[in-house]
Protein backbone atom coordinates (compact mmCIF):
# COMPACT_ATOMS: atom_id res chain seq x y z
CA UNK A 1 0.00 0.00 0.00
CA UNK A 2 1.28 3.47 -0.86
CA UNK A 3 1.98 5.91 1.94
CA UNK A 4 0.63 9.45 1.94
CA UNK A 5 2.98 12.14 3.23
CA UNK A 6 1.22 13.70 6.23
CA UNK A 7 3.06 15.92 8.70
CA UNK A 8 1.37 17.22 11.87
CA UNK A 9 2.62 20.10 14.01
CA UNK A 10 2.71 19.93 17.80
CA UNK A 11 1.20 23.36 18.43
CA UNK A 12 -2.30 24.79 18.30
CA UNK A 13 -5.56 23.33 19.51
CA UNK A 14 -7.69 23.28 16.36
CA UNK A 15 -6.82 20.91 13.52
CA UNK A 16 -6.30 22.57 10.13
CA UNK A 17 -5.55 20.35 7.12
CA UNK A 18 -3.79 22.13 4.24
CA UNK A 19 -4.05 20.82 0.67
CA UNK A 20 -1.79 22.28 -2.02
CA UNK A 21 -2.44 22.95 -5.70
CA UNK A 22 -1.51 21.36 -9.03
CA UNK A 23 2.16 20.51 -9.56
CA UNK A 24 3.22 21.50 -6.04
CA UNK A 25 3.57 19.94 -2.59
CA UNK A 26 3.06 20.76 1.10
CA UNK A 27 6.24 22.87 1.28
CA UNK A 28 4.20 25.69 -0.25
CA UNK A 29 2.66 26.30 3.19
CA UNK A 30 5.96 27.04 4.95
CA UNK A 31 5.37 30.78 4.39
CA UNK A 32 2.43 30.72 6.83
CA UNK A 33 3.44 27.84 9.09
CA UNK A 34 4.87 29.96 11.93
CA UNK A 35 2.02 32.47 11.71
CA UNK A 36 -0.56 29.70 12.01
CA UNK A 37 1.21 27.80 14.79
CA UNK A 38 -0.31 29.70 17.76
CA UNK A 39 -3.82 29.11 16.43
CA UNK A 40 -3.89 25.75 14.65
CA UNK A 41 -2.49 22.24 14.77
CA UNK A 42 -1.35 22.07 11.16
CA UNK A 43 -1.57 18.99 8.97
CA UNK A 44 0.66 19.34 5.90
CA UNK A 45 -0.22 16.87 3.15
CA UNK A 46 1.35 15.95 -0.17
CA UNK A 47 -1.59 14.90 -2.34
CA UNK A 48 -1.39 11.39 -3.87
CA UNK A 49 1.23 11.38 -6.64
CA UNK A 50 2.74 14.72 -5.59
CA UNK A 51 5.90 15.54 -3.63
CA UNK A 52 6.67 12.83 -1.07
CA UNK A 53 3.50 10.85 -1.92
CA UNK A 54 5.19 9.49 -5.05
CA UNK A 55 4.06 5.89 -4.87
CA UNK A 56 0.55 6.70 -6.05
CA UNK A 57 -0.45 6.61 -9.68
CA UNK A 58 -2.92 9.06 -11.26
CA UNK A 59 -6.20 9.38 -9.35
CA UNK A 60 -9.54 10.97 -10.12
CA UNK A 61 -10.98 13.50 -7.68
CA UNK A 62 -13.17 11.06 -5.75
CA UNK A 63 -10.36 8.53 -5.24
CA UNK A 64 -7.91 11.25 -4.22
CA UNK A 65 -10.37 12.61 -1.66
CA UNK A 66 -11.02 9.12 -0.28
CA UNK A 67 -7.30 8.41 0.10
CA UNK A 68 -6.59 11.70 1.89
CA UNK A 69 -9.57 11.16 4.19
CA UNK A 70 -8.15 7.81 5.37
CA UNK A 71 -5.40 9.71 7.21
CA UNK A 72 -7.51 12.60 8.48
CA UNK A 73 -8.45 13.71 11.99
CA UNK A 74 -12.14 14.18 12.65
CA UNK A 75 -13.63 17.62 13.26
CA UNK A 76 -10.79 19.43 11.47
CA UNK A 77 -10.94 22.53 9.33
CA UNK A 78 -10.05 21.75 5.72
CA UNK A 79 -8.26 24.31 3.56
CA UNK A 80 -7.62 23.67 -0.13
CA UNK A 81 -5.80 25.90 -2.59
CA UNK A 82 -6.70 25.77 -6.29
CA UNK A 83 -6.84 22.05 -7.22
CA UNK A 84 -6.60 21.31 -3.49
CA UNK A 85 -9.83 23.28 -3.09
CA UNK A 86 -11.64 20.69 -5.17
CA UNK A 87 -10.19 17.87 -3.05
CA UNK A 88 -11.10 19.62 0.22
CA UNK A 89 -14.58 20.38 -1.13
CA UNK A 90 -15.15 16.74 -2.11
CA UNK A 91 -14.08 15.64 1.38
CA UNK A 92 -16.39 18.19 3.04
CA UNK A 93 -19.31 17.05 0.90
CA UNK A 94 -18.68 13.38 1.66
CA UNK A 95 -18.09 13.81 5.43
CA UNK A 96 -20.08 16.84 6.56
CA UNK A 97 -20.72 15.37 10.01
CA UNK A 98 -16.97 14.94 10.62
CA UNK A 99 -15.63 18.19 9.10
CA UNK A 100 -15.66 21.40 11.17
CA UNK A 101 -15.44 23.78 8.22
CA UNK A 102 -14.22 24.27 4.66
CA UNK A 103 -11.89 26.99 3.34
CA UNK A 104 -11.14 27.26 -0.37
CA UNK A 105 -8.34 29.53 -1.58
CA UNK A 106 -8.11 30.84 -5.15
CA UNK A 107 -10.27 27.90 -6.13
CA UNK A 108 -13.38 27.33 -8.20
CA UNK A 109 -16.03 24.63 -8.14
CA UNK A 110 -15.62 24.51 -11.93
CA UNK A 111 -12.39 25.88 -13.39
CA UNK A 112 -13.39 25.74 -17.07
CA UNK A 113 -15.06 28.77 -18.61
CA UNK A 114 -18.52 28.42 -20.12
CA UNK A 115 -20.79 30.93 -21.84
CA UNK A 116 -22.34 31.94 -18.51
CA UNK A 117 -19.46 30.99 -16.21
CA UNK A 118 -16.10 32.79 -15.79
CA UNK A 119 -13.06 30.55 -15.74
CA UNK A 120 -10.04 29.31 -17.66
CA UNK A 121 -10.70 28.81 -21.36
CA UNK A 122 -10.87 25.04 -21.99
CA UNK A 123 -8.42 25.38 -24.89
CA UNK A 124 -5.84 26.86 -22.48
CA UNK A 125 -6.10 23.80 -20.24
CA UNK A 126 -5.95 21.55 -23.31
CA UNK A 127 -2.79 23.39 -24.38
CA UNK A 128 -1.17 22.82 -20.99
CA UNK A 129 -2.01 19.11 -21.23
CA UNK A 130 -0.49 18.93 -24.73
CA UNK A 131 2.64 20.87 -23.76
CA UNK A 132 3.26 18.65 -20.72
CA UNK A 133 4.22 15.77 -22.98
CA UNK A 134 6.52 17.96 -25.09
CA UNK A 135 8.31 20.04 -22.44
CA UNK A 136 7.45 18.92 -18.93
CA UNK A 137 9.66 21.32 -16.95
CA UNK A 138 8.86 24.44 -18.95
CA UNK A 139 5.11 23.80 -18.85
CA UNK A 140 5.10 23.51 -15.05
CA UNK A 141 7.19 26.68 -14.74
CA UNK A 142 4.82 28.52 -17.09
CA UNK A 143 1.83 27.49 -14.99
CA UNK A 144 3.57 28.62 -11.79
CA UNK A 145 4.40 32.01 -13.32
CA UNK A 146 0.71 32.56 -14.14
CA UNK A 147 -0.14 32.19 -10.46
CA UNK A 148 1.74 35.29 -9.33
CA UNK A 149 1.19 37.69 -12.25
CA UNK A 150 0.07 41.18 -11.28
CA UNK A 151 1.30 41.37 -7.71
CA UNK A 152 4.07 43.70 -6.53
CA UNK A 153 6.10 40.66 -5.50
CA UNK A 154 5.35 38.55 -8.61
CA UNK A 155 8.94 37.57 -9.46
CA UNK A 156 9.85 36.81 -5.87
CA UNK A 157 6.69 34.75 -5.38
CA UNK A 158 7.25 32.83 -8.63
CA UNK A 159 10.79 31.97 -7.52
CA UNK A 160 9.43 30.72 -4.20
CA UNK A 161 6.88 28.49 -5.95
CA UNK A 162 9.59 27.12 -8.25
CA UNK A 163 11.81 26.36 -5.25
CA UNK A 164 8.90 24.48 -3.66
CA UNK A 165 8.54 22.31 -6.76
CA UNK A 166 12.27 21.59 -6.95
CA UNK A 167 12.58 20.86 -3.22
CA UNK A 168 10.70 17.56 -3.53
CA UNK A 169 10.30 14.86 -6.19
CA UNK A 170 8.33 16.05 -9.21
CA UNK A 171 4.99 14.42 -9.98
CA UNK A 172 4.91 12.17 -13.02
CA UNK A 173 3.57 13.49 -16.32
CA UNK A 174 0.62 11.11 -15.94
CA UNK A 175 -0.29 12.50 -12.50
CA UNK A 176 -0.05 16.07 -13.82
CA UNK A 177 -2.19 15.18 -16.85
CA UNK A 178 -4.95 13.79 -14.64
CA UNK A 179 -4.70 16.86 -12.38
CA UNK A 180 -5.31 19.13 -15.36
CA UNK A 181 -8.17 16.89 -16.45
CA UNK A 182 -9.75 17.34 -13.00
CA UNK A 183 -9.41 21.12 -13.32
CA UNK A 184 -10.96 21.00 -16.78
CA UNK A 185 -13.91 18.70 -16.11
CA UNK A 186 -14.98 18.63 -12.45
CA UNK A 187 -18.08 20.61 -11.52
CA UNK A 188 -19.08 20.97 -7.86
CA UNK A 189 -21.27 24.05 -8.26
CA UNK A 190 -24.55 22.34 -7.43
CA UNK A 191 -23.30 19.94 -4.73
CA UNK A 192 -21.62 22.77 -2.80
CA UNK A 193 -24.86 24.76 -2.83
CA UNK A 194 -26.14 22.16 -0.35
CA UNK A 195 -23.11 22.28 1.97
CA UNK A 196 -24.33 22.92 5.51
CA UNK A 197 -21.05 23.47 7.38
CA UNK A 198 -19.12 26.77 7.79
CA UNK A 199 -17.56 27.64 4.42
CA UNK A 200 -15.09 30.44 3.63
CA UNK A 201 -13.96 31.28 0.09
CA UNK A 202 -10.79 33.39 -0.25
CA UNK A 203 -9.91 35.10 -3.54
CA UNK A 204 -7.16 37.30 -4.94
CA UNK A 205 -8.38 40.36 -6.84
CA UNK A 206 -5.53 39.98 -9.36
CA UNK A 207 -5.98 36.24 -9.90
CA UNK A 208 -5.64 35.36 -13.59
CA UNK A 209 -6.80 31.76 -13.16
CA UNK A 210 -9.93 32.18 -11.01
CA UNK A 211 -11.74 35.33 -12.24
CA UNK A 212 -13.14 37.54 -9.49
CA UNK A 213 -16.46 37.64 -11.37
CA UNK A 214 -17.34 34.29 -9.83
CA UNK A 215 -17.41 35.79 -6.34
CA UNK A 216 -20.78 37.52 -6.72
CA UNK A 217 -22.18 34.57 -8.65
CA UNK A 218 -21.30 32.18 -5.83
CA UNK A 219 -22.38 34.62 -3.12
CA UNK A 220 -25.83 34.35 -4.67
CA UNK A 221 -25.75 30.60 -5.38
CA UNK A 222 -24.19 29.69 -2.01
CA UNK A 223 -25.72 32.11 0.53
CA UNK A 224 -24.52 30.02 3.47
CA UNK A 225 -20.88 30.53 2.47
CA UNK A 226 -18.72 33.60 3.18
CA UNK A 227 -16.37 35.20 0.65
CA UNK A 228 -13.26 37.29 1.26
CA UNK A 229 -11.34 39.29 -1.35
CA UNK A 230 -7.64 40.08 -0.95
CA UNK A 231 -7.30 43.17 -3.09
CA UNK A 232 -3.56 43.10 -3.79
CA UNK A 233 -3.15 39.33 -4.15
CA UNK A 234 -3.26 37.00 -7.15
CA UNK A 235 -3.52 33.19 -7.23
CA UNK A 236 -1.22 32.55 -4.25
CA UNK A 237 -2.42 35.03 -1.57
CA UNK A 238 -0.85 33.15 1.32
CA UNK A 239 2.59 33.72 -0.24
CA UNK A 240 2.22 37.36 -1.27
CA UNK A 241 0.22 38.52 1.77
CA UNK A 242 0.69 35.95 4.57
CA UNK A 243 -0.35 38.15 7.51
CA UNK A 244 -3.63 39.23 5.91
CA UNK A 245 -4.28 35.64 4.86
CA UNK A 246 -3.75 34.12 8.31
CA UNK A 247 -5.92 36.88 9.77
CA UNK A 248 -8.80 35.67 7.60
CA UNK A 249 -8.28 32.10 8.78
CA UNK A 250 -8.24 32.94 12.48
CA UNK A 251 -11.26 35.23 12.18
CA UNK A 252 -13.22 32.52 10.37
CA UNK A 253 -12.22 29.85 12.87
CA UNK A 254 -13.29 31.94 15.86
CA UNK A 255 -16.42 33.51 14.36
CA UNK A 256 -17.95 30.78 12.21
CA UNK A 257 -16.66 27.55 13.66
CA UNK A 258 -16.09 27.98 17.38
CA UNK A 259 -19.26 30.02 17.88
CA UNK A 260 -21.39 27.78 15.68
CA UNK A 261 -23.24 28.63 12.50
From Swiss-Prot:
It is an enzyme of class 3 (hydrolase). Keywords: Biotin biosynthesis, Cytoplasm, Hydrolase, Serine esterase. The active site is at residues 82, 207, 235. It comes from the Bacteria. Transmembrane segments: none annotated. GO terms for cellular component: cytoplasm. Pfam families: Abhydrolase_1. GO terms for biological process: biotin biosynthetic process. Gene3D superfamilies: alpha/beta hydrolase. It catalyses: 6-carboxyhexanoyl-[ACP] methyl ester + H2O = 6-carboxyhexanoyl-[ACP] + methanol + H(+). Residues 16-241 form the AB hydrolase-1 domain. Belongs to the AB hydrolase superfamily. Carboxylesterase BioH family. Monomer. The physiological role of BioH is to remove the methyl group introduced by BioC when the pimeloyl moiety is complete. It allows to synthesize pimeloyl-ACP via the fatty acid synthetic pathway through the hydrolysis of the ester bonds of pimeloyl-ACP esters. This is Pimeloyl-[acyl-carrier protein] methyl ester esterase. It comes from Photorhabdus laumondii subsp. laumondii (strain DSM 15139 / CIP 105565 / TT01) (Photorhabdus luminescens subsp. laumondii).
Amino acid sequence: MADLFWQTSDEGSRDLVLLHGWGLNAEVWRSIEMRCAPHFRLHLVDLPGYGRSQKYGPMNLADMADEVWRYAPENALWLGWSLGGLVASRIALDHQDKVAGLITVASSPHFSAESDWPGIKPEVLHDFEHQLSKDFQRTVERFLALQTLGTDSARQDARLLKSVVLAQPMPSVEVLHVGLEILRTEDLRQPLAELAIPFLRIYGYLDGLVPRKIINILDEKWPRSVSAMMRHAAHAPFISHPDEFVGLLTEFASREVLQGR
